[in-house]
Amino acid sequence: MNLDALQQRLGYRFSKPELLQQALTHRSHSAQHNERLEFLGDSVLNCAVADMLYGMFGKLDEGDLSRVRANLVKQQALYEIAQMLQLSDTLRLGEGELKSGGFRRPSILADALEAIVGAVFLDAGFDAARALIRKLYIPILEQVDPRTLGKDAKTLLQEYLQGHKIALPQYNVIATHGAAHSQQFEVECTVPKLEVRVFGTGASRRAAEQAAAKLALDEVQKLVPQLLKRSRAERTGKTRKQPVPQDPQLSLRLKE
C-alpha cells in the first residue's frame, strides 16, 4: 500500500511506516488491527486538544473548555477530519466490511483517525502528535465561536434573551401527528416582548422544541438590534437640549 499521499496530507512522514499501515487496518481485515492504537490515540488527542484550548482561550472557564473539547473530539468531528484527509481511500477492511460500505462509516473513519494519532505518538512522541493535532484543528477553531460551540438552540436562545434582559421564551405543544410509534410533534415557541411566534416539528417533543428554538433565535437576532437602535434614538431625542423660549418683556428692555 502506497501511503505517500496520505503522509503528505497529514504533513507528517513516519519513520516506521508499518505503524501507519496498522492504524488504517480494521479488525475485520487482520489480527494486527488498529484498536490498541485507537485507544492510545484517544488519550493523546484529548490531552493535546485540552492543551491547545487552554492556551488559545484564556477567558473560558473549566466548564466551557470541557464543552468545546468534547465537541472537537466527538465522532462527528473526527469523521469530518477523516473525510478531509481522504482516509476512506486508504483503509484496510475485510471483504464483508468493504462490501457493506464500511469505508464510509463514520465510526470506522473516526477510529482510524484516532489510531493515526496513536501511531504518530509511538513513532515520534507527544510533541509530534500534538503538532499534527494542531495542524488539523487550528483551521476549525478559526471558524467557530468557542462560547457557543456545542450548545443547543434552546440554550443559545435563552442566553441571548437573558443577555438583553428579555423574558424567556414559552414552548407549547400544539399538535401531534401520526401513529404512536412514529409521532411527529409540533411545538410553538413565542417571545412575547418581540412578538415572535414560530413553529417547529420533530420526532419528539424535545426535538420539536429545539427546531422551534432555532427559528426563534434567527428571528430574535434580527429584531433585537433594531429594538436597541430605536431605544437609543428615543433616549437621544429626550436628552437633546431644547431651545429656551425668550421672555418678550426682557427683549423689550434690552432694546431700550
UniProtKB/Swiss-Prot annotation:
Q: Name one GO molecular function term.
A: metal ion binding
- As recorded in UniProt, its EC number(s) are 3.1.26.3
The segment(s) forming the RNase III domain are 3-125
Chain residues that bind Mg(2+)? 38, 111, 114
- Judging by the UniProt lineage, the source's domain of life is Bacteria
Against Gene3D superfamilies, the record matches this protein to: 3.30.160.20, Ribonuclease III domain
Question: Keywords, A to Z?
Answer: Cytoplasm, Endonuclease, Hydrolase, Magnesium, Metal-binding, mRNA processing, Nuclease, RNA-binding, rRNA processing, rRNA-binding, tRNA processing
* Record's GO cellular component terms: cytoplasm
Q: Could you say which enzyme class this protein belongs to?
A: hydrolase
The active site lies at 42, 114
The Gene Ontology biological process terms listed for this entry are:
mRNA processing; regulation of gene expression; rRNA processing; tRNA processing
Disordered: region residues: 230-256
* Catalysis performed (reactions): Endonucleolytic cleavage to 5'-phosphomonoester
Q: Which cofactor does it need?
A: Mg(2+)
**InterPro entries in UniProt:** dsRBD_dom (IPR014720), RNase_III (IPR011907), RNase_III_dom (IPR000999), RNase_III_sf (IPR036389)
**Ranges for domain DRBM:** 152-222
Q: What is its main location?
A: cytoplasm
Where in the cell does this protein reside?
Cytoplasm
Tell me any Pfam family this protein matches: Ribonucleas_3_3
Q: Which family does it belong to?
A: Belongs to the ribonuclease III family.
Entry function? Digests double-stranded RNA. Involved in the processing of primary rRNA transcript to yield the immediate precursors to the large and small rRNAs (23S and 16S). Processes some mRNAs, and tRNAs when they are encoded in the rRNA operon. Processes pre-crRNA and tracrRNA of type II CRISPR loci if present in the organism.
The cross-references to PANTHER family, in alphabetical order and at most eight, read: RIBONUCLEASE 3, RIBONUCLEASE III
Assembly description: Homodimer.
The molecule here is called Ribonuclease 3
Q: Which organism is it from?
A: Cupriavidus necator (strain ATCC 17699 / DSM 428 / KCTC 22496 / NCIMB 10442 / H16 / Stanier 337) (Ralstonia eutropha)
> What gene, per UniProt, encodes this protein?
rnc
